Design a protein with these regions (language model features):
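Caspase-like (clan CD) cysteine peptidase catalytic core
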Residues: 53-130
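Boundary/activation segment at the start of structured domains
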Residues: 1-88
Length: 130
């Protein structure tokens, strides 16, 4: 089985909105959900404007659980590299005063991916510092 998790976030608070991230996940879904002959390809879960880091992490854990053939994680939204060089993806809930650059460190995501029994793992980040 092939599974995909597509996260696109346009709506960030405090003037940090983006445009096109929801359109991006719609385009990716259209490209991977079915083969050219119309037969099923990827089972797709879309999470537009997901609110919290917890929701994102739960979805990532679920995507890479089990022993499926392929798992694809696509993120379109804000990304950041902190002062230690850690790469971070940024759900909506990180845009609160004093916590803007906390987000989800890629090392946290990669620890889930690297211990997964999924055979083929694909990660696509469409954000700054990806």
């Amino acid at each position: 089985m092939k599974k995909a998790l597509l996260i696109g976030i346009n709506d960030y608070p405090e003037g940090n909105e983006l445009t096109g991230c929801i359109e991006d996940i719609n385009s990716v879904k259209a490209a991977i959900e079915r083969h050219g002959d119309g037969s099923p390809n990827f089972g797709v879960k879309m999470m537009p404007n997901v609110q919290t880091s917890g929701e994102v992490m739960d979805a990532i854990r679920k995507l890479f659980a089990g022993n499926d053939d392929t798992a694809l994680f696509y993120f379109s939204g804000h990304g950041y590299m902190n002062s230690t060089g850690a790469e971070i993806v940024m759900p909506q809930d990180i845009a609160t005063p004093g916590q803007y650059y906390t987000g989800i460190q890629m090392s946290t995501i990669m620890s889930i991916v690297n211990t997964s029994k999924v055979r083929n793992k694909i990660i696509i980040l469409d954000c700054c510092h990806s």
